[in-house]
Amino acid sequence: RMDTALSWVKAYVPDLDVTPSEYTDAMTLTGTKVEGYKELDKNLEKIVVGEILSIEKHPDADKLIICQVDVGNEKIQIVTGAPNVSVGDKVPVVLDGGKVAGGHDGGPLPENGIKIKKGKLRGVESFGMMCSIDELGQDKNYFPDAPESGIYILPKDSKVGSDAIELLGLRDTVFEYEITSNRVDCYGVIGIAREAAATFKKKFVLPKVNETGNSENVADYLSVEVKDNELCKRYIARVVKNIKLAPSPAWMQERLRAVGIRPINNIVDITNYVMAEYGQPMHAFDYDLLEGHKIVVDRAGDGEEFETLDGVVRKLDKDILMINDAKKAV
């Protein structure tokens, strides 16, 4: 299985202008089978960026608050039970008559979404609703900054009144492909984009890479040993200095989410991004934690146990290839 976002494909085929159904039919006919697609903005209507101007307690409900919210062309009153909002927060607001994709509990999404209408909560009028990630139809596990419960807080520099769905990168379509083993070139977005360019007879534009480096030799810092050339023909390493961990840019997080990869931080996200883009697996290691400053590629021992990132201890066998440092599997 391979997923790509249409916007990511268009980054390399800028003149591509097709509907999701046209894309699906044409790509499948030319041999790149599309199993289906998902429109990320399905049932998301009239949702804008709002800024909370004031908050006061509800006179008749301890768990409700009354917010005055600037939504661009007007100020509206919204009653909410969200525990995590503050004055000055920018939030997604669905206006009267708009739609959200689901409920706040993250359960199955209703086919036609949920219509939002102005009404009264315990006697106080409310003219819209502030949205959680669940209500936007998204999996909060792919939004590292999303609260476990409550409203999703947008970046401080978000423009009040602008399209919140566009801001979150949800005006997009994600396609799922069935890639056969003889087309490993299509296990990356660039391979899919190349196929799309050929299918629709459009210009294919490779991303520009500005390689930077210096005269230092990687071998002065790190050694790589491949002990099994049958399973691993080549292993390459580079050393990157002066790293500062931080969140990756919003555009990168949006593309990763669209293809089913959870954003973590700038370093992990860059390696996952390149993997999704080129189909080339990558991994970043902390140099200071790499015993002997060495990478050893070898088969696992029969019955060897290894705890993976999900916290599960797995029993390995000799047909599994492992990456180790000088002392242990990493």
State where each predicted segment sits.
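Short acidic, glycine/serine/threonine-rich loops at helix termini
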Residues: 62-65, 102-114, 141-144, 189-190, ...
